[in-house]
A protein has these predicted regions:
Chain A
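N-terminal adaptor-interaction module of cullin-RING ubiquitin ligase components
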Residues: 1-111, 115-116, 124, 129, ...
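CRL adaptor-proximal regions
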Residues: 1-25, 142, 401, 411-431
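Inter-repeat linker/turn residues at the boundaries of leucine-rich repeats
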Residues: 51, 61, 89, 112-115, ...
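Conserved hydrophobic beta-strand positions in leucine-rich repeat
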Residues: 66, 92-96, 118-122, 146-148, ...
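Short, solvent-exposed loop/turn at the beta-strand->alpha-helix junction
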Residues: 72-78, 100-105, 126-131, 152-157, ...
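A structural signal for leucine-rich repeat
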Residues: 81-85, 107-113, 133-139, 159-165, ...
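Eukaryotic tandem repeat interaction scaffolds
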Residues: 223-358
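C-terminal interaction modules of eukaryotic adaptor/scaffold proteins
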Residues: 366-431
Length: 431, 439
């Protein structure tokens, strides 16, 4: 453990005068080590104990990983500047999630003083613009993870700067940065071959070319989230490689069964697949998928309106690990499909969450079948108007820990205590 | 069970939010009395751009959203709250809570903060307040929020949609006034809005608006005879009409289907004092120029050499006399309505004040006092105050117009004897206006 040289003299001076045993018994290195296990709040408290402790607690080595989210979010730029001066090269990980008043100026200071930062989270720092990313690209070549979720001023320029300066990047999140387009993504894909996770929810300009680049240049890509990129077609999705584990293409309304078939052949290890609002998908695609992707655990099929019980039959047979299945607004699903699902190998052990809201054909019968799903913890039944209160009560009797989400008014417990009160007031009794 | 309850409530809040954000033309909200739900059906209804919430869930939803807001939105400065809501959840909760109970100023203030932080859009705020007002048309907080929004909006922005903005604002006032009789908040909002526009839109447009509002208030007044808030607004409109330019006055006269001069002459002819020989016939009076008519009615020469704007003076008298006949008509139709009698007081007060003003007098502690001419600022200090006042006062009381008005009032009070307000009106004129000796 080392601490900044400029403080060594001061520590020697203060420790001589201290009466406290702990300071005498333990060497400074050990104290520093102990302090390094504390969180932000405790460190700040320790810093108020004595001059010695102040120096120790605020030593940069204790501040390698900082997350201000639970501590304080209305921080001003000066706080970040202080942090970056104190931590210097020690800082590895910084989360400024939700610190909305942070702007470019202080982020530039940070990039200059903390060149070793590896993980930076700027989620919802709405004032951050391309200048921050340019500074990061110039200084912080070790950056591996960057989260720019909901920073609307971030554009392709940022992605280019980051790809030029940070070749080690593995995780990138640019969700809701609406100006991001194919050019930025292509630059990133070309110069960051180690990329494992790319998330760009709601970036409407991300198109087939962008995703194709990611698929060809980043062979390790495991996580891809292109929710709401409605320009995407089967062309790019079919190019995704075998490393893919978690894929979210919700809201990519142009996708058809071709994508599903391609995923089935190329990405057999898929664990999570979100396909909400892909309304063109049919049973045929899911048949192919269920045959080869046997590791699937989570599937979101909300508003895949064309799928029928056949899909459920295939999923039940092909995906024994299925934990979470959302079938909201799949209006053709009937009790038969649920019955098949409940008889599958996944049902008894794995299935924990099942979303059936707005499936108008689901009736009380479905709930009776689900009794065999011992692990079921949550079932969503909003707006399934054929499901009655009695059926839910029966299901609860069999699965006491289940949570049922439906539009039934919660039963209010009868008001207790009204009848138990003595009819006469206490004073009358005494007299 | 509590988890499920919370999930249900949050789902309902989300449903409401979905309807609010997806339906742009939403114009009404209400709570639908459905006490029990046998079917697993959403309590949030959206039919023909109206949002409804079934009553069985209101209590739970309100409890949840209110406590959530109070615990987590940092309203108590003492208690340092750990969890802070993000702006979207905060907005969702604010929407639902305020729709159910709009009388929470704290929450409205939170919304204002959000507008200042650009987390909320001003136009969506206008829509939301409108929705709130559709259920609670008397909610002052919603009106004041609207005023705040409009104030910042009108001050800071170059406005492209001013016309539609004015229209929607007036429509909102119409709807709220219509839904709830005697809606003071609605009418004072309308009044504030017109006053606010004075600094913003061009004079011509403003005059057109004054005329429109005058006509509107007349229609409204004759349908809502005991809504004094409306009468108050009418008085505001009349005062605005005083300031019309010549051009606008022409369009104003053309827009009406009555001739002001004829109404005035008719009133005069019916109540000419008997003891005097009137040379002018009705036709003559109609064709008189404004100046001549005023000379005939007031027969007064100002002591100083200033020119009196007899045209505008004549217009004011015409306007007020029309108002007086209108009021008499309404009173004959709808008896025993206090607010109309109060409106009559206003009219007479205006007429009498105007005459005092013309004669260079004003009432101070119930006594007439001579004031300096407002144009040339000369005071005749040589003559004694008392003497001048006596002579001017005599002039005033002998003028045709004054006698006509007094006679007309006497007649009207006799006519509506059975109305107890008539007696009060007489007392008002005698004691408050100091016409005891003359009636």
């Amino acid at each position: 453990m080392s601490y900044s040289t400029r403080n060594k003299f001061e520590i020697a001076r203060f420790s001589g005068e201290e009466e406290n045993h702990i300071n005498k018994k333990l060497p400074k290195e050990l104290l520093l080590r102990i302090l390094s296990y504390l969180d932000v709040v405790s460190l700040c408290r320790c810093a108020q104990v004595s001059k010695l402790w102040n120096i120790l607690a605020l030593d940069g080595s204790n501040w390698q990983r900082i997350d201000l989210f639970d501590f304080q979010r209305d921080v001003e730029g000066s706080v970040i500047e202080n942090i970056s001066h104190r931590c210097g090269g020690f800082l590895r990980q910084l989360s400024l999630r939700g610190c909305e008043s942070i702007a470019d100026g202080s982020m530039k200071t940070l990039a200059q003083s903390c060149p070793n930062i590896e993980d930076l989270n700027l989620n919802k720092c709405k004032k951050v613009t391309d200048h921050t990313c340019q500074a990061l690209g110039r200084r912080c070549s070790k950056l591996q993870r960057i989260n720019l979720d909901s920073c609307p001023s971030v554009t392709d320029i940022s992605l280019k700067a980051l790809s030029d300066g940070c070749p080690l990047l593995t995780h990138v999140n640019v969700s809701w940065c609406q100006s991001i387009s194919e050019n930025g993504v292509e630059a990133l894909a070309r110069s960051c071959p180690k990329l494992k996770s790319f998330i760009c929810r709601g970036c409407k300009n991300v198109n087939d070319r962008a995703v194709s680049c990611l698929a060809t240049f980043c062979v390790d890509l495991e996580v891809l989230n292109v929710q709401g990129c409605d320009n995407l077609t089967d062309d790019s999705i079919s190019k995704l490689g075998g490393a893919m584990r978690r894929l979210c293409v919700s809201g990519c309304t142009r996708l058809t069964d071709t994508s599903l078939c391609a995923l089935a052949t190329k990405c057999p290890d898929l664990v999570t697949l979100e396909l909400a609002q892909c309304a063109q998908l049919t049973d045929a695609g899911f048949q192919a998928l269920a045959r080869s992707c046997r590791m699937l655990e989570r599937m979101d099929l909300e508003e895949c309106v064309l799928i029928t019980d056949t899909t459920l039959v295939h999923l039940a047979m092909g995906c024994p690990r299925l934990e979470k299945l959302t079938l909201s607004h799949c209006e053709l699903i009937t009790d038969y499909g649920i019955k098949q699902l409940s008889m599958s190998p996944c049902a008894a052990e794995h299935l924990t969450v099942l979303g059936l809201d707005n499936c108008p054909l689901v009736t009380d019968g479905a709930l009776e079948h689900l009794i065999s799903c011992h692990n079921l913890q949550l079932i969503e039944l909003y707006d399934c108007q054929m499901v009655t209160r009695n059926a839910i009560r029966k299901l609860r009797n069999h699965l006491p820990n289940i949570k049922v989400h439906a539009y039934f008014a919660p039963v209010t417990p009868p008001v207790a205590g009204g009848g138990a009160r003595p009819r006469y007031c206490r004073c009358c009794n005494i007299i | 069970m509590t988890d499920e309850k919370q999930a249900l409530v949050e789902k309902i809040i989300k449903d409401v939010h979905n309807v609010l954000s997806k339906t742009a033309e939403l114009y009404a909200f209400d709570i639908v009395p459905v006490e029990t739900n046998f079917r697993n059906k959403s309590p949030v209804m959206c039919i023909e751009n109206c949002l409804g919430l079934e009553s069985w869930c209101v209590k739970q939803v309100y409890l949840h959203s209110y406590t959530e807001l109070m615990d987590k939105a940092c309203f108590q400065t003492q208690k340092k709250c750990r969890q802070v809501l993000d702006s979207e959840t905060l907005l969702r909760l604010l929407n639902v809570t305020l729709l159910i109970n709009p009388d929470l100023s704290v929450l409205w203030n939170k919304r204002k903060e959000m507008v200042q932080e650009l987390l909320l859009d001003t136009s969506s705020e206008l829509k939301f307040t409108r929705l709130v007002l559709s259920r609670k048309p008397k909610c002052n907080d919603a009106f004041s929020h609207r005023r705040w929004i409009l104030g910042t909006y009108l001050n800071n922005h170059q406005i492209n949609y001013l016309e539609s903005l004015i229209n929607t604002e007036l429509i909102v006032c119409d709807l709220t006034a219509d839904k709830c009789p005697n809606n003071y908040h609605s009418w004072s909002h309308r009044l504030w809005f017109i006053n606010k526009l004075k600094n913003i839109i061009k004079q011509n447009d403003m005059h057109a608006l004054y005329i429109k509002e005058y006509n509107f208030s007349e229609r409204w007044m004759s349908k809502h005879v005991s809504d004094f808030s409306c009468f108050h607004y009418r008085q505001f409109c009349i005062k605005n009409i005083y300031n019309l330019s010549n051009v606008s006055w022409k369009t104003f006269e053309n827009s009406l289907d009555i001739n002001f001069r004829k109404v005035l002459v008719c009133l005069l002819a019916k109540n000419f004092p008997k003891d005097r020989t009137i040379q002018a016939s009705e036709q003559d009076l109609v064709s008189y120029s404004e100046e001549n008519l005023m000379k005939f009615l007031l027969s007064y020469n100002n002591s100083c050499s200033c020119n009196v704007d007899s045209v505008s003076l004549c217009r004011k008298f015409e306007l007020l006399c029309y108002e007086l006949t209108l009021n008499s008509e309404l009173l004959r139709f709808y008896k025993h309505h206090e607010s109309m009698w109060y409106h009559r007081r206003f009219i007479l007060h205006e007429i009498i004040e105007m005459m005092y003003d013309h004669f260079g007098l004003f009432r101070h502690n119930g006594v007439l006092v001579k004031k300096s001419c407002k144009y040339c600022k000369t005071t005749d200090l040589k003559q004694k105050q008392a003497k001048i006042i006596r002579s001017h006062g005599d002039c005033l009381y002998k003028s045709v117009l004054f006698q006509v008005i007094i006679k007309h009032e006497k007649k009207f009070i006799q006519e509506s004897e059975e109305d107890k307000h008539a007696v009060r009106h007489e007392k008002y004129l005698k004691l408050i206006q100091g016409l005891n000796n003359l009636m």
